[in-house]
Amino acid sequence: MVIEPQLPAAALSALAELCRRYGRALYVAEPCGHMVPDARVVVSTALSGGTLRQRLRDACRRFEARRLALDLACVRMDFSLPAPYGTGTALTPQQLTELRGRRTVFFSPELCARYFTYEQSGMTHFVLFDDGDTLHRKIALGTELGIPAGFLALPEAMEALPRLLGKG
């Protein structure tokens, strides 16, 4: 059972007891990780700053790697710069393809994501996105750190499946 919003501790404890009784795991959002000591904690791999390695190391220290599960978000975001709050506009796969055009795409080892920049109406934009390769790298990093599980949302990550399944 996966619980995404933050619930009161009493509700989480009741759900945890139900899951224990039926031999099921309870997955909770990171802010709830300390409320239920035996719950699995879902940690997002989507970043707009810092490093993914440090983010996951910090989560491993707070909760133990064996309790973690990666939320392998397939990010496609367009940020107008400067972006002081790290928020951008979500892009559809078609919008990403159109914006990408013939632009040079780079890989950020810190974010474990691909990116490119462009200018429009005098504004610089930074487009951050995932593909099968970046998601594969995130899974490999999680494995290296001892994180045993992860979630991949469909249909958002559909294009990445062939690479993740070793067929692309």
Where are these regions (language model features)?
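Extracytoplasmic/secreted cell-surface and envelope-processing proteins
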Residues: 8-13, 78-83, 158-164
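Acidic/aromatic/glycine-rich contiguous surface patches that form carbohydrate-binding/processing clefts
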Residues: 138-168
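Residues lining hydrophobic/aromatic ligand-binding pockets adjacent to catalytic sites
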Residues: 39, 53-57, 63
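A structural motif corresponding to the C-terminal end of an alpha-helix
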Residues: 18-24, 59-67, 137-148
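Well-ordered, non-membrane alpha-helical segments in soluble/globular domains
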Residues: 8-17, 48-58, 90-93, 132-136, ...
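Chitinase-like catalytic core of GlcNAc-active glycosidases
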Residues: 1-48
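Short, acidic/polar
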Residues: 32-34, 55, 130-143
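Glycan-binding loop/region signatures in secreted carbohydrate-active enzymes
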Residues: 65-137
